[in-house]
Curated annotation (Swiss-Prot):
Homotetramer. NCBIfam families: Gln_ase, PRK00971.1-1, PRK00971.1-2. It is an enzyme of class 3 (hydrolase). InterPro entries: Beta-lactam/transpept-like, Glutaminase. This is Glutaminase. It comes from Klebsiella pneumoniae (strain 342). The lineage of its organism: Bacteria, Pseudomonadati, Pseudomonadota, Gammaproteobacteria, Enterobacterales. The gene is glsA. Belongs to the glutaminase family.
Amino acid sequence: MAAVINNAMLEAILAEIRPLIGRGKVADYIPALASVSGDKLGIAISTVDGQHFAAGDAHERFSIQSISKVLSLVVAMNHYQEEEIWQRVGKDPSGQPFNSLLQLEIEQGKPRNPFINAGALVVCDMLQSRLSAPRQRMLEIVRRLSGVADIAYDPVVARSEFEHSARNAAIAWLMKSFGNFHNDVATVLQNYFHYCSLEMSCVELARTFLFLADRGIAPHLEAPVIAPIQSRQVNALMMTSGMYQNAGEFAWRVGLPAKSGVGGGIVAIVPQEMAIAVWSPELDDAGNSLAGVALLEKLTQRMGRSVF
């Protein structure tokens, strides 16, 4: 399976993609992210049979941002019954920008899915209700999944996002007005921004998300992370809603479940085979890594992998 993959192959693909750097734009609405150099490019792959590959800036940590929304959903799945989650947040793509208020108003405070901001805030609200220390719990889970003990939040990024949180606060208050938000808004926003500020490398992300390629099982942990059916459900949500309003185009070009973040990272899953993490900070108009999407497209073509 993984015989076609090696570090030299990944380096060659990076060289083909590198000319795209300069065509996107680093996220500038979060000041702490705006200072990141746009010329970074990295990829890492972890396979279910225990192989690991990396190239470029794969060992450099960056702000994972909305990739964390997958992890917060997984934590919620371990603390809530299925119906408790999905009566408060939907399972459908939104077709709208990830921070849209319009759709939320029309649909009476129930977000379309857990990977847009409104949906992730509902999930964080649920974690606040059920966990005594949700920020510490998330850190423990990420460190356990990755096998890396020093993964941490970036307090500068978290503070920067909180200081520019008017729109997310508006989303939370709108949901509160519809009865779909139960805790203190500022407290939940702080948790949400800390999750987004997690600093991880491509290598760490690929290992962390490997459980989604293996029916909810992380190879180095005794107990399953989530049940096989839940792993399938998370992959389905990533396929339909993980790439903001460009999920359809990404499915067309790449054909894998994936989740992106405005820090320039993307995690993609080849079910039963591998987890892939890429990073390039310059974004396209939808907020996805421009070179990162192209890198995944080239890689999946080279490997002949797709869920379709």
